[in-house]
Amino acid sequence: MSRLSWKKEHKLLRKPEFDLCYEQGKKLFTKSFILFVLCHGSGPSGVRLGLTVSRKKGPAVVRNRIKRVLRSYFRINQEIFQVRADIIIVPKRALDGKTITYALAEKELLPMVGKINKLSCGGE
């Protein structure tokens, strides 16, 4: 399978997984996003991604565009993560979902990758 695939084991899918990340995860902030990062020493390798986009961001077309751009960023850059972590991304109100681009996501999230890789992840 292609190295650019995004398998099911790289996704946060269930409410308990999201709740655990919200409660115990570390918050990181950018201009347009809030990231909840929960490092773990065991489980699937690499990063698992969860996306939460509120209905306040606009109609389904806009919300799906935001999620599509963010998934694309993580799918293409999945190899630069050096930790095992669950990451939830929540767009802030300042983000205009109609004009979000891959370049904007990369500009804001690339510095966060460095911070995520430096997090203390259970002695790894």
Curated annotation (Swiss-Prot):
Catalytic activity: Endonucleolytic cleavage of RNA, removing 5'-extranucleotides from tRNA precursor
GO MF term list: 3'-tRNA processing endoribonuclease activity; ribonuclease P activity; tRNA binding
Class of enzymatic activity (EC top level): hydrolase
Gene Ontology annotations of biological process type: tRNA 5'-leader removal
The family this protein is said to belong to: Belongs to the RnpA family.
EC number: 3.1.26.5
Matches recorded under InterPro entries: Ribosomal_Su5_D2-typ_SF (IPR020568), Ribsml_uS5_D2-typ_fold_subgr (IPR014721), RNase_P (IPR000100)
Keywords, sorted A to Z: Endonuclease, Hydrolase, Nuclease, RNA-binding, tRNA processing
Physiological role: RNaseP catalyzes the removal of the 5'-leader sequence from pre-tRNA to produce the mature 5'-terminus. It can also cleave other RNA substrates such as 4.5S RNA. The protein component plays an auxiliary but essential role in vivo by binding to the 5'-leader sequence and broadening the substrate specificity of the ribozyme.
Gene name linked to the record: rnpA
Keyword tRNA processing appears in the UniProt entry: yes
Subunit structure of this chain's protein: Consists of a catalytic RNA component (M1 or rnpB) and a protein subunit.
Keyword Signal part of the UniProt annotation: no
Pfam families: Ribonuclease_P
GO CC annotation: ribonuclease P complex
Protein name per UniProt: Ribonuclease P protein component
